[in-house]
Swiss-Prot record:
GO cellular component entries: mitochondrion; TORC2 complex
Protein name (database record): Proline-rich protein 5-like
Residues with Phosphoserine modification: S28
Residues covered by region (Disordered): 312-346, 351-370
Gene name tied to this protein: Prr5l
Gene Ontology biological-process entries: cellular response to oxidative stress; negative regulation of protein phosphorylation; negative regulation of signal transduction; phosphatidylinositol 3-kinase/protein kinase B signal transduction; positive regulation of intracellular protein transport; positive regulation of mRNA catabolic process; positive regulation of phosphatidylinositol 3-kinase/protein kinase B signal transduction; regulation of fibroblast migration
Biological classification of the source: Eukaryota, Metazoa, Chordata, Craniata, Vertebrata
Length: 370
């Protein structure tokens, strides 16, 4: 058997080696051999990205001009933006929308308002804001739904653009003073909504100019300068309680903010985090989102409630030794409310049980005597 296998080995190796073909000159690397195919694929991808972005740009400008989306156009735009996010342009979509598309679209809105003078300008501004807030803004959010902003969402970017490129350029200072008696409610809504949007870097010059406009139509008004000191009804109420009951530790809004170790203006003007886009929904699923817009007011109410309840407790322990319960109101909307109740602590629930038990005993005694 060894004699039969020995002569076959060189023949097999010779056959296997016969299939090898020499590589052409200058094509020894496999990367260089596939370079033309890579270049063709890259050019096709760039053409696809350009066509997708052109369709998005055309749709956005059409929305600013007052037009709408056609049937199934929103789905096609979302798919185009998803392809753009996976391309080299993905990291520049938000910047390009803010600096190019939004600026170009809002220029049409500004020109429409500047054509009118006096009271007519206020009426046109109210109409423009109603259309922008109810039609344009939701459509922009729907078109750029796949985009997940890093610092600002599409909604915040659009509102800041309307503030800087439309409202502050039409110069409404003198017009607002003359038209205060017949000022449309849409203008007041516009000023308050724009005031609620803050830049990540803190209050800018545009925000300070907006505050000057809000002061003319909203009273009372608490500006950035007013936040530096505890003034107004809150301060007078805290001072009155501290004078009557010197032992009570007053927990006010200013001390609560300073204990955190951050400046008060920085805390109050910190922009609210709005989570949008598909990345956030994939992370959270169907969890209900709660707003934090009233976080500071909730802290202030909690501080005042704590101060008042502690003061009532001291009065009860001083002379009469009576058990004073906090006023309990029937919660008709408790099942639908997402805000925590201050009066739902375990100790207060026990006090309510004791009070209800004593009330039942007194009723039984009265029934036995009768």
């Amino acid at each position: 058997m060894t004699r039969g296998l020995a002569p076959l080995l060189p023949i097999e190796f010779h056959k296997m080696g016969s299939f090898r073909r020499p590589r052409p000159r200058f094509m020894s690397s496999p990367v260089l051999s596939e370079l033309p195919r890579f270049q063709a694929a890259r050019q096709a991808l760039q053409l696809s990205s350009n066509s997708a972005w052109n369709s998005v740009q055309t749709a956005v400008i059409n929305v600013f001009k007052g037009g709408g989306l056609q049937s199934n156009e929103l789905y096609a735009l979302n798919e185009s933006i998803r392809r753009l996010l996976k391309s080299e342009l993905g990291s520049f979509i938000t910047d390009y929308f803010q600096n190019q598309l939004l600026a170009k679209g809002l220029s049409f809105v500004e020109e429409k308002i500047k054509l009118c003078e006096g009271d007519n300008r206020i009426e046109v501004l109210a109409e423009v804001w109603d259309h922008f807030f109810t039609e344009t803004l939701p459509t922009l959010q729907a078109i750029f739904y796949p985009v997940q902003g890093q610092e600002l969402t599409i909604r915040q970017i659009s509102l800041l653009g309307f503030r800087d490129l439309v409202l502050l350029k039409v110069k409404l200072g003198d017009v607002l003073l003359l038209a205060q008696s017949k000022l449309p409610s849409s203008v007041i809504q516009m000023l308050l909504i724009l005031q609620s949007v803050h830049e990540p870097t803190g209050p800018s010059e545009g925000y300070l100019q907006l505050e000057e406009l809000v002061k003319q139509v909203v009273s009372p008004f608490l500006s950035i300068s007013g936040d530096r000191s505890c003034s107004g009804p809150t301060y007078s109420l805290a001072r009155r309680h501290s004078r009557v009951r010197p032992k009570v530790t007053v927990l006010n809004y200013a001390s609560l903010m300073t204990t955190v170790g951050r400046p008060l203006n920085e805390m109050v003007l910190t922009p609210l985090t709005e989570q949008e886009g598909e990345a956030y929904l994939e992370k959270c699923g169907s969890v209900r989102r709660h707003t934090v817009a009233n976080a500071h007011s909730d802290i202030q109410l909690l501080a005042m409630a704590t101060m008042m309840h502690s003061g009532l407790g001291e009065e009860a322990g001083g002379e009469d030794k009576h058990l004073l319960l906090p006023p309990s109101f029937p919660p008709p909307h408790r099942q639908c409310s997402s805000e925590p109740s201050i009066l739902d602590s375990p100790d207060e629930l026990e006090l309510e049980d004791v009070a209800s038990g004593s009330q039942e005993d007194s009723e039984l005694n009265c029934a036995s005597l009768s």
